Regions:
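Conserved sequence signature across two-component system core domains
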Residues: 8-9, 33, 51
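Two-component/phosphorelay signaling modules centered on CheY-like receiver
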Residues: 12-31
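The feature encodes the CheY-like receiver
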Residues: 58
């Protein structure tokens, strides 16, 4: 199972709660970023297995970040998160190249692991 994670989200409280949830369930959070450009830099520098990526960021949306990260193919697996429902984004999730989508209120290590299998 992929183990290392970078969390990209502009809300410090969500980053802290996501870190606590994932680390309690065996994931290792190796980095965090508060916007898309910092997230791309962190992902390239830290080379995590998984990126937990908020759809709504201050400088660019998560779909653009995902496309940028997927340019080289291969890892990391990108999982989009949002406080909104997946249906609100239409086909953008599928078009982004992300491994999947998890509503923020459903985030858990098991949910993430199931999506990565």
């Amino acid at each position: 199972m992929p183990n290392t994670v970078v969390i990209i989200d502009d809300h410090p409280s969500f980053r802290a709660s996501a870190r606590a949830i994932l680390e309690a369930e065996g994931f290792e959070v190796v980095g965090e970023a508060a916007d898309g450009s910092s997230g791309i830099a962190a992902a390239r520098m830290l080379a995590p297995d998984v990126i937990l990526l908020d759809v709504q960021l201050p400088d660019m949306d998560g779909f653009a970040v995902c496309r940028e990260l997927n340019l080289n193919g291969g890892p990391p697996a990108v999982v989009l998160v949002s406080s909104r429902d997946a249906a609100d984004y239409g086909g953008l999730i599928e078009q982004s190249g992300a491994r999947g989508f998890i509503p923020k209120d459903e985030l858990g290590g098991t949910t993430l692991a199931d999506l990565l299998e």
